A protein has these predicted regions:
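Bacterial Sec-dependent signal peptides at the C-terminal "C-region" and cleavage site
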Residues: 14-27
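Bacterial N-terminal signal peptides that target proteins for export
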Residues: 1-7
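Non-catalytic cap/lid and distal C-terminal segments of serine-dependent acyl enzymes
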Residues: 60-103, 108-576
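Residue-level marker of intrinsically disordered, low-complexity segments enriched
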Residues: 7-8, 91
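Contiguous beta-strand segments within globular domains
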Residues: 26-56, 226
Length: 576
């Protein structure tokens, strides 16, 4: 036994003494991605920072009908990402299944990808460095006129799509090269900026963009906000002034407010809107949508927040006054109402609640969570984990999205892991990221303090307390009802489908319970529920037909509301 033991020890020492080059090579799959000189020059030409800080992606797809980068999503194709620093032309970055810094979706590791034939593409999301007024320095993807979609953003570099055969465990290395840069839809004028895009004016739609002094001071560099302005029929031939319907929501790009089209009819609930807007029967109003994409998302949520800065003030103190100076707009609260769906629904309600004297009415359809006891389907105050419900023997994933018949389309974990793969430190440009950025405090590293661990879903209740104190709309109303009730009388109009795709009806029920049962004094509010209606339901037709309300019908409702609340001395030639 002693002889055998001695031989084993000697053998072990001999193995340890072998040169490093004789160690077994990794069996993990790897992609090497090189940044070409042409791509770097293209990034610089659009005014973005170099050497490049950002996030590098490799995306794979089984088909080549569209580029792989255009097939990502919660039910989309696999991709992996890694943060990069100071990347220069000619340099190469490796994404390996053996590297814990590389994280992907729906497979966390590249090595989890099944064997097969694929089409692969690389994309480099280019970040901008901000030295903010709060003392933090952060690197983020600056909006480049596309909202905040890193897969389509001008200035980001992409490779050609390459067909490959992937064999897990083979240790094979696949080379890719970033050779071109995504270009903006509309050219940047001399001395201009990619931010918020640069769409050209049309007959009735005018595009405005201004430098915001408030936001520029906060972010430490020039920041812009804009608006798409839909003018009424006859605007150019009259000297009349008009009330404004501010349509809230996601980044509109070059789209006209209300879905208006110069060419003809819109679709869905916008059908007939364009013809109605031009008709003799339409109320003569101006409609406006904001272009307020930012480093976190395609809209700012129209409020001041610790992570995004003073977007609420930038809108009401800079952008709206500028619009009122450039167009014949009635600068009065009664002539200034807001409406929107989903994100825009939360924005419209929050703007009215947090600034009740500034806005004259709000229509919030299928709004984002107005009470964080139901942050979609997560109670951030009492639940321990956002991704699962648990009992002694069972662990069940929380649903994130459903069909109107109840079938589950995705889970909270899946969408959060999708965002984590898209961007570390809340830089995904996605829905859950912007909620953390708007509702939450600044973390020690300058990025938003997470409401829960992005990998495990464990909730941070101290951060949840901050959410409640600052952005829980129902909590805010209950805490300030005595002073606010009279200012909101007749101004809140909310609609939600009782099968909302993202469970957003749950928070509406809680707000409804307070406004229509508990609140004293009671005020006039309107809350509708649509039976078996999904996201984003906007309410029933005022005709009583049981059909869904059209956009043209809503324009009439908003006009009636403003005319009814206008002072007796107001000029109402616009109303019909």
């Amino acid at each position: 036994m002693r002889t055998r033991t001695l031989l084993l020890v000697i053998a072990g020492l001999l193995l340890l003494s072998q040169p490093a080059c004789q160690q077994p090579e990794s069996s993990s799959i790897s992609f090497t991605v090189r940044l070409s000189e042409e791509a770097l020059q293209g990034i610089e030409a659009l005014g973005l920072d170099t050497p490049v800080r950002g996030r590098l992606f490799v995306i794979v797809s089984r088909d080549n009908e569209r580029e792989p980068r255009l097939q990502t999503g919660v039910s989309g194709v696999p991709f992996w990402g890694i943060d990069v620093e100071d990347l220069r032309a000619g340099e190469t970055v490796t994404l390996s299944g053996a590297d814990a810094e590389v994280f992907g979706y729906p497979f966390a590791s590249i090595d989890e990808l099944p064997e097969g034939e694929y089409h692969v593409q690389a994309l480099l999301s280019v970040y901008t460095t901000f030295e903010r007024a709060d003392g933090h320095t952060v690197s983020m993807h600056l909006n480049a006129g596309e909202g905040q979609d890193q897969w389509r953003a001008p200035g980001n570099a992409i490779s050609d799509v390459v067909p490959i055969h992937i064999s897990p465990g083979s240790g094979k290395v696949y080379p890719l090269a970033l050779q071109s840069v995504i270009q903006p839809d509309h050219p940047v004028p001399p001395g201009g900026s990619l931010q918020q895009g640069n769409p050209p004016d049309t007959d009735k739609v005018k595009y405005v963009k201004i430098r915001s002094a408030l936001l520029s001071e906060f972010w430490g560099r020039d920041m812009y906000i804009g608006a798409n302005v839909l003018l009424p029929e006859g605007y150019e031939t009259s000297n009349q002034s008009y009330p404004v319907l501010y349509m809230q929501g996601h980044f509109p790009g070059s789209g006209a407010p209300l879905g208006y089209s110069e060419e003809g009819e819109g679709r869905g609930r916008n059908a007939g809107l364009s013809e109605f807007w031009r008709s003799a029967d339409s109320p003569r109003m101006i409609a406006v949508s904001f272009r307020d994409a930012n480093p976190y998302y395609d809209t700012s949520y129209s409020v001041n927040s610790a992570n995004l800065g003073p977007y609420g003030d930038a809108i009401t103190q800079e952008l709206v006054p500028y619009l009122e100076s450039q167009f014949r707009i009635i600068p009065a609260s009664w002539a200034r109402v807001a409406a929107g769906g989903s994100t825009g629904g939360w924005e419209a309600v929050a703007m009215q609640v947090f600034q009740p004297d500034y806005w004259g009415g709000a229509w919030g359809w299928c709004p984002d969570p107005l009470d964080f006891n139901y942050h979609q389907i997560v109670n951030v105050y009492e639940d321990e984990n956002a991704y699962y419900t648990e009992s002694e023997w069972h662990k069940v994933e929380r649903p994130n999205a459903r069909s109107f018949d109840g079938n589950i389309r995705s889970t909270v974990r899946q969408e959060n892991h999708l965002e984590l793969a898209t961007g570390s430190r809340t830089r995904s440009g996605g829905q859950w990221a912007i909620w953390e950025a708007v509702f939450g405090p600044v973390g020690k590293d300058g990025y938003p303090q997470a409401i829960w661990d992005p990998l495990t879903g464990k909730i941070d209740h101290a951060t949840a307390d901050y959410w409640r104190a600052n952005f829980d709309v129902n909590h805010y109303l209950q805490s300030n009802w005595e002073t606010m009730s009279s200012k909101l009388d007749g101004k809140l109009h909310i609609a939600a489908g009782d099968m909302d795709s993202y469970y957003l009806d749950n928070a509406v029920y809680l707000l409804d319970e307070f406004l229509n049962k508990e609140a004293q004094p009671r005020i006039d509010t309107e809350i509708q529920y649509g039976r078996r209606k999904p996201h984003c339901w906007t309410g029933y037709s005022p005709t009583g037909s049981g059909e869904d309300m059209t956009t043209a019908e809503f324009v009439r409702i908003a006009a009636d509301h403003m005319a009814r609340n206008a002072p007796a001395s107001a000029d109402k030639k616009w109303y019909r």
